[in-house]
Amino acid sequence: MLSKFSGSRQDQQFVLLLVILLGILGISLFLAVSMGSVAIDLGDTYRIILRRLGFPLEIGEVSKSTLAIVWNMRFPRVLLGLIVGAGLSMCGSVMQSTVNNPIAEPYVLGISAGATLGATLSIILGLKVMISLGAFLGAILATIAVLIIASMQGRMTTSSLILSGTVVNALFLAFSNFIISVGANADSVMTIKFWTMGSLAGTSWADLVLPTIVVGTAFLFFSTQYRVFNAMMMGDEAALTLGIPLRFYWYLYVTMVAVLTAVLVATCGIIGFVGLITPHLARGLVGTNYKRLFPVATILGALFVIWADVLSRIIIPNAELPIGIFTALVGAPFFIYIVGGRRREVRT
């Protein structure tokens, strides 16, 4: 009876937390749209967006340029930040469970290095319209290489996955640096530099279609996998004892994470540390049960990228910085904190 009451109370607290986070996310959407090099009244932003979404609100006297900035430029950009942040956070949550390692994130498999190589080749060859396709193909190629190397001894393990990702990451980055050193001009180097640091600039409504479909589908699927994630976090032997076919789920999850990350990277470049930070923040809020952790981490990821993008737009007047700079400034100290915490646990 007591356990039922305790469980019911935890469920109520979890639902309350979700409502609060979703409320913060909704407010953040309007605030983020109103902030930028051209400040827009929050009330105008609110009315323009809701009016365009079909709500019977009067916009009032608003210039055409303000309408264009809000609806055609900033709102799609903020929505893409939400989608990318949610997707990267989902990938991080899944990877940390799949390899049972709290410092794993989507890029641990060398996916970012593969995307960088593909994008670099496209830029150097003058195929700038194919940067996204090149990044996607490079990310998929890197993932295939990781899976092949990890399975070379006949049995893929979490350790072999991590080691293979490290090797592929180093190899692909070396190829990228070689290509840049040999064939890049000043314009190409600047394009590559900005792309590899991530940016949501220039987002249009058309850019939202594919990421929305992929991230939405992945969220629905991964939300049903919490029992498998919880078993994996107990270790390989415990998961096998519970009847979990680890090899099947390793291939399935790694492939899905690779495709999801490749789509996101191809859309906005490389935005690091999102998948590392947000699952840990979620654990601090709701514990390690993936039934609660996964949706909370997803919302936190969306919030993180939205506000990192806002900083990239406003910190320098009339200029814009790559969003990856701000995620790295937060993520690098956080990574050190996690590693330091693990070392203290080992000593004790």
Regions found by a protein language model. Give the residues of each.
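Alpha-helical transmembrane segments in inner-membrane proteins
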Residues: 1-348
